Amino acid sequence: MNEEVWAVVKYKPKEGCEPEFIDALSTLDMSHVVLNRYIKAYNGEIVQIVQSCNIDEVLAGQVAGLEWLDSVSHLLEHYGESRTDAISGVIIDDA
């Protein structure tokens, strides 16, 4: 499958843990994707925006990404049962 995939992942650092979490972002290897950017939202969340050429790129980083998330889990508030609030999908060419 050659469809371009975009993902948006939100993280909510616990109070007082934001600097450590932001430092930890630099240890996440995202060299397998086209674009990886972080923004700090006004509500305190850290938002990751990722562009991948295809689903194979997404899968290539999945294990390492989950291991990294495990390593920073203690720094994060949860979204219900989840450590992140994430969504992904493919580009709509005709829009």
What do the PLM-derived regions correspond to, one by one?
Residues 10-23:
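Short, surface-exposed ligand-recognition loops at beta-strand->loop->(often short) alpha-helix junctions
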Residues 38-43:
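A short beta-turn/loop motif at secondary-structure boundaries
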Residues 85-95:
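Acidic/histidine-enriched, glycine/proline-rich intrinsically disordered or flexible terminal extensions
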Residues 27-37, 51-86:
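An amphipathic, aromatic/His-enriched active-site/gating alpha helix that lines ligand/cofactor pockets
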Residues 4-11, 49:
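Active-site-flanking beta-strand signature of metal-NTP-handling nucleotidyl enzymes
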